[in-house]
Amino acid sequence: AYRTRAYVNGTSSNSIAIPGYNSQPNVMYKTHVQSFGWQNWKQNGDCSGTFGKSKRLEGINIKLSNCGYSGSVQYRTHIQSYGWESGWKQDGAMSGTSGQAKRLEAIQIRLTGEMAQHYDIYYRVHAQHFGWLGWAKNGESSGTAGYAYRLEGIQILLVPKGAAAPASNYGGMIQNNPNTFIAR
């Protein structure tokens, strides 16, 4: 973060610090996990959900904070028995289910407006039997189809346009499969 100074009578000796704008936006997300319920908000590549505990993700909320650009984050999930949600959720609305014991099987996430012009949104999931899949970005599908396998965890990152994609061992979690979406 940086600070902006306001000068009184044009001299620096009379300046006061005003909190400035931190130019790095954040992506924040939380998941509803089988038996555990809603987890706390995670951000910027932290793992939300579980892995190694055989618990399904049932719902997800995603939002942006600290944005210097217009636009939003939109997302939709592939839900057990229902398939892909017909509409996109955005800005913290819940995608998936709560209280229905339905697993999430895949997800798509995209940015809109100026955010989409300046950032890519990367995400990857921990899928039952496959582990961490490769990174998907900008609306691509991440997860499985035709297997009836649950999502167990997710990581989401904002990356400035033109910057390198996240590594396959981001956050110490090693990618098990380079595919982002596995269909039967």
Cite the ranges covered by each PLM segment.
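Extracellular fibronectin type III
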Residues: 9-23
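Beta-strand-rich modules
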Residues: 1-9
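Lectin-type carbohydrate-recognition ectodomains
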Residues: 22-184
